[in-house]
C-alpha cells in the first residue's frame, strides 16, 4: 500500500528591492538623424518654374518663391533659352545656397545649408527630358563644386512622406500640406519645395511634432542612404 505524502505549503518569499542598481538598458533601436544645418533649402527644379523654399533652422523664418527665367509671355521680350537658361538657373540656385537669396547681397555672408532636391521624374520624353536632365546635372555639379551637401529625393518618396502614398497627385499633395502643416499653396512647385524642407527637418530632427509611421520609414531610408553614400560623415 502506498502512503500519500502530506501537502506542505511553501511560503512565498518577498525579494527586497535593492536601491541604487541601474535599470536594464533598453534594446530599442535609437533613431539616427543627420546634424542640423543653419538652413534647409528645398528645390523642385524646372526649366520654366523652379520652386524653392528656404528655412532658417535657428529662427524658424521661411521664405519661398518660384524662379522663372521667362515670366513674360510677350513676344516683345526675348526669352532665355538653351545654355543661357541653364546658367541663369545655376547662378540663382548658387546664390540661394550660399547667401540665402536669389540675388547675391552686396555684403552677404556664406550660410550653412542642406539642400533637399527632388529627383528626376522619368515621365518626360524627347527634348524636354533631355533638357531636364541637363538642368539636373548642372545643378548637382554646382552644389558638388561648392561643397554643399544635398540629398536627392525621388518624387514617389516625397509623395509618400507627405500623403502616405507614393502615387499621390498634385492636388492631393496640396491638400495634405494644408491639413498637416496648415500651409496653403496655390503653386505645386512651391508646395513640393516646402514638402522637401519638411523632410529635411525630419532627417535632421528639427521638425515640429511627432512623425507618422510612414514618415519615420521614409526618414530612416533617407538617413541610411546618406550614410551609405557618405561613410566618412556618418
Positions of PLM-derived features:
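Phosphate- and other anionic-substrate recognition elements at nucleic-acid/protein interfaces
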Residues: 2-234
Amino acid at each position: 500500500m502506498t502512503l500519500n505524502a502530506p501537502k506542505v505549503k511553501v511560503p512565498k518569499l518577498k525579494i527586497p528591492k535593492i536601491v541604487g542598481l541601474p535599470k536594464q538598458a533598453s534594446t530599442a533601436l535609437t533613431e539616427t538623424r543627420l546634424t542640423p544645418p543653419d538652413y534647409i533649402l528645398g528645390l523642385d527644379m524646372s526649366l520654366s518654374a523652379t520652386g524653392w523654399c528656404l528655412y532658417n533652422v535657428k529662427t524658424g523664418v521661411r521664405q519661398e518663391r518660384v524662379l522663372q527665367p521667362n515670366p513674360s509671355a510677350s513676344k516683345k521680350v526675348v526669352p532665355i533659352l538653351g545654355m543661357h537658361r541653364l546658367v541663369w538657373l545655376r547662378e540663382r540656385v548658387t546664390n540661394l545656397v550660399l547667401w540665402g537669396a536669389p540675388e547675391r547681397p552686396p555684403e552677404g555672408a556664406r550660410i550653412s545649408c542642406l539642400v533637399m532636391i527632388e529627383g528626376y521624374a522619368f515621365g518626360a520624353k524627347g527634348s524636354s527630358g533631355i533638357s531636364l536632365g541637363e538642368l539636373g546635372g548642372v545643378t548637382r555639379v554646382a552644389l558638388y563644386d561648392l561643397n554643399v551637401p544635398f540629398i536627392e529625393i525621388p518624387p514617389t518618396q516625397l509623395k509618400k512622406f507627405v500623403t502616405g502614398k507614393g502615387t499621390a497627385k498634385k492636388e492631393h499633395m496640396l491638400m495634405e500640406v494644408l491639413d498637416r502643416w496648415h500651409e496653403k499653396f496655390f503653386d505645386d512647385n512651391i508646395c513640393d519645395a516646402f514638402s522637401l524642407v519638411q523632410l529635411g527637418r525630419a532627417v535632421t530632427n528639427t521638425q515640429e511634432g511627432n512623425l507618422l509611421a510612414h514618415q519615420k520609414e521614409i526618414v530612416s531610408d533617407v538617413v541610411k542612404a546618406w550614410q551609405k553614400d557618405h561613410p566618412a560623415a556618418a
